[in-house]
A protein has these predicted regions:
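Glycine-rich loop-to-alpha-helix module at the N-terminal edge of alpha/beta enzyme cores
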Residues: 2-4, 11, 54-138
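Active-site and channel-lining beta-strand-loop segments
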Residues: 36-57
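General beta-strand structural signal in soluble alpha/beta enzymes
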Residues: 55-58, 116-118, 143, 201, ...
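PLP-dependent aspartate aminotransferase-fold enzymes
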Residues: 102-198
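Short acidic, glycine-rich surface-loop motifs adjacent to enzyme active sites
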Residues: 195-210
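Catalytic PLP-binding core of fold-type I/II PLP enzymes
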Residues: 211-237
Length: 237
């Protein structure tokens, strides 16, 4: 079945189905803004609305399409792989799992010998926080006001109230704490309690509007983490 230029699939029908079954808030917001885009054809760094309008995609889904939409090399690799393999089984090792893990860890500094796979950035953050808690046997997590690390279980708890409150993901009092960007004193005030498992920071806070950290701030946070036995998580997902 072809989805592009299919006369049986109309933009109006897709919008109705989206309102009825997918994300009514987001869909309605774009309709209200007179920007009810329904992505159809996509190639490289462009995509087309179902009504034929062509757009330059400078958002690239938050970096997902950094090699462009439907990159031919990626499509070829996926197609070739699917002729022999599928996702496998999470209980057993597999050829591609082992080969990819080896390749990833070969790019890391000495001592980083293992790779864990996840399906999204939020899952990766969850795994990082769980690993930090396991390694330090501490529970508290410090993040930056205005940050966004995902919408999964632990990742959403690091974010602003508008993300976590609707899902009752605030955690216990003091479990997830936010401090102001570039305020090393506020950061140290939390870390010196010596009960913080990890500090998680985006090098560039995209959802916050890309404020630039002060020179030396990130390095200063890393030094404070080392001083007080806290792990530093750089969220580059």
């Amino acid at each position: 079945m072809s989805y592009i230029n299919n006369p049986d699939i109309t933009k109006e029908d897709i919008l109705k189905k989206s309102l009825a079954h997918w994300n009514v808030g987001k869909t309605q917001e774009w309709i209200d803004r007179d920007m009810a885009i329904v992505m159809g054809k996509r190639e490289g760094y462009y995509f087309w609305d179902m009504d034929g309008r062509k757009f330059l995609d400078i958002h690239i889904n938050g970096g997902t399409y950094n090699l462009g939409h439907r990159n031919k090399e990626i499509i070829g690799a996926l197609t070739d792989a699917m002729t022999e393999l599928d996702i496998g089984n999470h209980h057993f090792t597999g050829i591609t799992k082992a080969l990819l893990a080896e390749q990833l860890t070969s790019l890391c500094p000495d001592g980083l010998d293992y790779a864990c796979f996840s399906t999204c950035g939020g899952e990766a953050v969850d795994l990082a926080i769980k690993s930090a808690r396991y390694a330090t046997q501490r529970k508290r997590v410090v993040s930056i006001q205005g940050c966004y690390h995902g919408h999964t279980g632990l990742s959403v708890s690091t974010g602003d109230a508008r993300f976590k409150d609707p899902f009752l993901c605030q955690g216990a009092p003091g479990e997830f704490v936010q401090v102001t960007l570039n305020d090393l004193d506020a950061m140290e005030a939390e870390l010196k309690k010596e009960d913080v498992a990890c500090v998680i920071i985006e090098s560039l806070l995209a959802t916050y509007g890309f404020p630039i950290p002060d020179k030396g701030y990130l390095a200063g946070v890393k030094k404070l983490c080392e001083k007080y036995g806290t792990l530093y998580i750089a969220d580059e997902t």
